[in-house]
């Protein structure tokens, strides 16, 4: 990213937009979130050489109840859901799709306990990655892989689902909100040049 590049905050009154959060690196910690209503903090970051590197929508689906998995967009494809032991009490889920030797896409989900120690995090199913190869996009694979992963997570006793999506990924945002997720926050990732 060029040194002079800086994203602007969305215009308009705060009440017209989702809750906004700002992500910045704390000393010896990962990322922290702070409301963008704290203008003095954003000002301090800017004065000290920080700029917005990326922005994310945070989505949540409490008590998620996915529609049962439907038929694969291509019945000839090999789709496998694997349970992988992660940091939580419940296993993580990886859903992988291949057609012959070509990768169609994958959906990687983790326990919220991967990122937080709170007991409630044990039952949070976090969709860490959903990707479909370019040649297979537009055929329903993203929705299918997400549905398969969420169905597997629900069977494992996860209660809530969450996902984050880049601010300019409108197709993904539309998919997630149509499927049942709701925007609960908006974050900015600051970096120092």
PLM regions: where:
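Ligand-binding pocket scaffold of soluble enzyme catalytic domains
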Residues: 77-79, 99, 107, 130, ...
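A conserved beta-strand-loop-helix scaffold within acyl/acetyltransferase catalytic domains
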Residues: 87-93, 98-131
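Conserved active-site alpha-helix within GNAT-family acetyltransferase domains
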Residues: 22-54, 143, 167-185
């Amino acid at each position: 990213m060029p040194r002079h590049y800086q994203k602007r905050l969305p215009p308009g009154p705060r009440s017209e937009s989702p809750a906004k959060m700002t992500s910045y690196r704390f000393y010896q910690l990962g990322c922290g979130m702070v409301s963008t209503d704290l203008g003095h903090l954003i000002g301090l970051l800017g004065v000290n050489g920080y700029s917005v590197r990326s922005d994310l929508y945070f989505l949540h689906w409490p008590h998620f109840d996915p529609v049962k998995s439907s038929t694969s967009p291509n019945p000839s494809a090999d789709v496998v859901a694997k349970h992988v032991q992660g940091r939580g009490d419940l296993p993580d889920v990886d859903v992988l799709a291949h057609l012959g030797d070509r990768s169609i896409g994958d959906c990687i989900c983790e326990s919220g306990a991967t990122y937080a120690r709170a007991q409630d995090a044990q039952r949070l199913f976090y969709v860490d990655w959903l990707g479909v190869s370019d040649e297979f996009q537009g055929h329903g694979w993203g929705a299918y892989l997400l549905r398969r992963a969420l169905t597997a997570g629900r069977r494992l006793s996860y209660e809530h689902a969450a996902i984050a999506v880049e601010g300019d990924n409108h197709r993904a945002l539309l998919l997630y909100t149509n499927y049942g997720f709701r925007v609960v926050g908006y974050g900015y990732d600051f970096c120092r040049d």
